[in-house]
């Protein structure tokens, strides 16, 4: 493990844009990246695991954590609450890992105020038609829910210009390569390289 601290990344997207699939593929290829496990009050979906996908808690417990100041950010989405543990986040960064927060624009605004050094990425679908097709293809939700999420997606996408990077997920492999490029280019910044290779640089140039 290197001696440089990790970078905090915010990754946001409307539901159905492919954010989760892209982040999953990214972390499989890069062992230096971790994904923050958020707390949520929503019901567990088939295939999900407590402590892996989310920390699933009841509303009363979530409100208690807010009162204790345990969340870096928290937001309400579709009637459910989501929040990010402040202490767990900092511990991961201190270990030298890059950390991804998969949060919406509301959470992103909160995080930027407290950690302005965070880099942010917004993932867009190629069109509203493609987004609706992806939502329909899930087969998990009713037409009413899909219509509501389409409306919510538009209100989410309005905030794309608040982010440092924008990736359009038309072709998955291309979008994944773009996401990898964001992480790799940041690691090559002068400050990061000076931290990572301090001993080597001192040996070469004194």
UniProtKB/Swiss-Prot annotation:
GO cellular component: cytosol
Entry-linked Pfam families: Guanylate_kin
Principal place of residence: cytoplasm
PROSITE patterns to which the protein is assigned, alphabetical: GUANYLATE_KINASE_1, GUANYLATE_KINASE_2
Listed Gene3D superfamilies: Guanylate Kinase phosphate binding domain, P-loop containing nucleotide triphosphate hydrolases
Guanylate kinase-like domain span: 6-184
EC number: 2.7.4.8
InterPro entries: GK/Ca_channel_bsu, Guanylate_kin-like_dom, Guanylate_kinase, Guanylate_kinase_CS, P-loop_NTPase
GO molecular function per UniProt: ATP binding; guanylate kinase activity
Binding site for ATP: 13-20
Keywords from the named record: ATP-binding, Cytoplasm, Kinase, Nucleotide-binding, Transferase
Localization per Swiss-Prot or TrEMBL: Cytoplasm
Swiss-Prot/TrEMBL catalytic activity: GMP + ATP = GDP + ADP
Similarity section: Belongs to the guanylate kinase family.
Stated role: Essential for recycling GMP and indirectly, cGMP.
Protein name: Guanylate kinase
UniProt organism field: Pseudomonas putida (strain ATCC 47054 / DSM 6125 / CFBP 8728 / NCIMB 11950 / KT2440)
Gene expressing this chain: gmk
């Amino acid at each position: 493990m290197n001696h440089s601290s990790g970078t905090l990344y915010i990754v946001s997207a409307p539901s159905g844009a492919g954010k989760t699939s892209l982040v999953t593929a990214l972390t499989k290829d890069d062992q230096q990246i971790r994904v923050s496990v958020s707390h949520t009050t929503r019901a567990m979906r088939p295939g999900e695991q407590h402590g892996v996908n989310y920390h699933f808690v009841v509303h009363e417990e979530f409100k208690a954590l807010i009162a204790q100041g345990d969340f870096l950010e928290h937001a309400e989405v579709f009637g459910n609450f989501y929040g990010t543990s402040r202490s767990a986040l900092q511990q991961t960064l201190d270990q030298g890992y890059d950390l991804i927060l998969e949060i919406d624009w509301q959470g992103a605004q909160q995080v930027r105020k407290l950690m302005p050094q965070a880099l942010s990425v917004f993932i867009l679908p190629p069109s509203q038609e493609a987004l609706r097709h992806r939502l329909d293809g899930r087969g998990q939700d009713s037409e009413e829910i899909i219509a509501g999420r389409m409306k919510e997606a538009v209100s989410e996408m309005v905030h794309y210009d608040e982010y440092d990077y924008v990736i359009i997920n038309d072709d998955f492999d291309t979008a994944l390569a773009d996401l990898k490029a964001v992480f790799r280019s940041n690691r090559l910044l002068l400050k990061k390289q000076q931290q990572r290779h301090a001993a080597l640089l001192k040996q070469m140039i004194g």
